C-alpha cells in the first residue's frame, strides 16, 4: 500500500481514535510479513497523540501475517477483558491483503476465536481489492463483530461507522 491509499488508511485509523473517549484505552498493532509489538494499551486522554503519531509514521512493507496478528491481538485483549469486564474489548482489524505469512491457518484462527470464553469482539475491514472479504467476513462473524469493505474514497467513513459500536 502506497500513496493515497496509505494516506487515507492512516487518516481513517486516526479518525477512529478521535471518535473514542478520553477514558477509553487503545493499542495499535502493525503487521506485514510479521507481527510487531503492540503500542499500548494506553488511555486515550494522555496517549491519543502518541498513537496518532505512530500511525502517521507507519510504512507499508510486503507480506501479510493477518491470522497471527489477529490471534496475538485477540489473546492480549481477552486477557485484559478478564481483568476488567467493565469495558468494551474489541479488535478493529484493517488489511489490504490476503494472509500469506502466518504460521497458523484460517481454521486454526477461527477455532481459537470460537473456543475462547471471551467478551472480545472482532471487527474487520477489507481495504481495497486485494483483501479477501469472504475470509474477513467469517472472522468478524465468529468474533461476534462486523465486517466492512473500504476504499481510499470511503475508509475514513468506514472507521467512523466502526467507532459508533463503541
PLM regions: where:
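Exposed acidic/Ser/Thr-rich ligand/metal-binding surfaces
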Residues: 1-25, 30-123, 129-166
Amino acid at each position: 500500500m502506497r500513496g493515497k491509499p496509505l494516506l487515507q488508511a492512516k487518516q481513517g485509523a486516526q479518525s477512529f481514535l478521535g471518535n473514542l473517549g478520553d477514558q477509553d484505552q487503545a493499542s495499535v498493532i502493525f503487521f506485514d510479513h510479521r507481527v510487531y509489538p503492540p503500542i499500548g494499551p494506553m488511555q486515550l486522554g494522555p496517549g491519543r497523540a502518541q498513537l496518532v503519531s505512530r500511525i502517521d509514521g507507519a510504512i507499508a512493507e510486503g507480506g501479510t501475517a493477518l491470522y497471527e496478528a489477529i490471534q496475538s491481538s485477540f489473546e492480549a485483549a481477552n486477557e485484559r477483558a478478564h481483568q476488567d469486564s467493565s469495558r468494551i474489548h474489541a479488535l478493529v482489524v484493517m488489511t489490504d491483503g490476503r494472509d500469506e505469512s502466518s504460521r497458523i491457518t484460517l481454521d486454526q484462527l477461527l477455532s481459537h476465536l470460537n473456543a475462547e470464553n471471551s467478551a472480545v469482539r472482532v471487527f474487520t475491514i477489507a481495504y481495497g481489492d486485494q483483501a479477501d472479504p469472504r475470509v474477513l467476513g467469517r472472522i468478524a462473524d465468529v468474533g461476534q463483530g462486523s465486517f466492512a469493505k473500504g476504499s481510499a474514497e470511503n475508509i475514513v467513513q468506514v472507521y467512523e461507522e466502526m467507532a459508533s459500536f463503541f
